[in-house]
Each structure stands twice: as structure tokens, then as C-alpha cells.
A protein has these predicted regions:
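Peptidoglycan-targeting cell-wall enzymes and recognition modules
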Residues: 4-83
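Short, amphipathic alpha-helical segments
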Residues: 65-73, 89-93, 110
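Long, charge-rich low-complexity segments
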Residues: 113-127
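Acidic helix/loop microenvironments that form the catalytic cleft of cell-wall polysaccharide enzymes
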Residues: 3-7, 87-109
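Short, charged low-complexity intrinsically disordered segments located at boundaries
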Residues: 9-13, 31-33, 102-114
Length: 127
């Protein structure tokens, strides 16, 4: 749901509003590393291990656009850094609250829920 709301599943991967599927701003990316991941070397090593070996050193923010595993890990770390518990995967309103808290403070819950209902909910329907 967050990827759908942030970038329409990739329609806006690299914009002024952030990089990748989760539209992570460069400053937030840097702050996450400096203020959260750096405090836990084991966790930082696991997340860093998801990034490209050489490309990360020359363009760490580009990794958010070209590496889905790394981008998803960073998005999850952004949520984890707020000490927020993940809700049930089929609870769009609870996910919307996380989205607004972590990714889009100005976002409207109903917009997230509408996006979730249009793009994620169909995946839960029986075939």
C-alpha cells in the first residue's frame, strides 16, 4: 500500500520528492543512516549488504531507485525507527496511519485507503 501511494508502483521513481518506489528523500535517507542505522552496526551491515557493492559508495541515493530490496529495507527501517508496530496486512486504515506518520505527514488517510483498495485489496480476493 505504501509503495502504491508513494509512487503509483513506480510511475514516479526518481523525482524531487524522493527516490524509488517509496519516494525516499535524500535527507531522510542520510538521517536514517546517521541517526538510526549507525547506532546498530549489525543491522546497518545487514541493510548495507542489500546495496550494490560499488554503486552504493558513489551514489547511495540512486540505490533507492534501482535496488528494490535495498529501497524496501530502508522504508521498513524508516518505520522501525519510529517504534511503530506493523498492523495486520489487511488493515488499510492502520497502514494509512503509518504512511502519514512516516512518509506523508500532509497525506489524507482516505487517499491512502482509496489507493490501497484499488491496487492492493484485489490481491486479497479469492480467485
Amino acid at each position: 500500500g505504501i509503495a502504491a501511494s508513494q509512487s503509483a508502483f513506480g510511475a514516479a521513481l526518481d523525482s524531487r520528492r524522493g527516490h524509488g518506489l517509496y519516494r525516499t528523500p535524500e535527507l531522510r535517507h542520510k538521517q536514517l543512516w546517521d541517526n538510526y542505522l549507525a547506532l546498530d552496526p549489525d543491522l546497518a551491515s545487514r541493510v548495507r549488504g542489500l546495496a550494490s557493492q560499488h554503486a552504493f559508495l558513489s551514489g547511495p541515493h540512486l540505490e533507492l531507485t534501482v535496488n528494490l530490496r535495498y529501497s524496501t529495507a530502508i522504508a521498513l527501517m524508516m518505520i522501525e525507527a519510529t517504534n511503530t508496530l506493523l498492523p495486520a496486512e489487511d488493515d488499510p486504515l492502520a497502514m494509512a496511519r503509518i504512511w502519514r506518520t512516516v512518509f506523508q505527514p500532509q497525506g489524507r488517510l482516505r487517499d491512502f485507503v482509496a489507493c490501497w483498495n484499488a491496487s492492493v485489496a484485489p490481491l486479497y480476493l479469492p480467485a
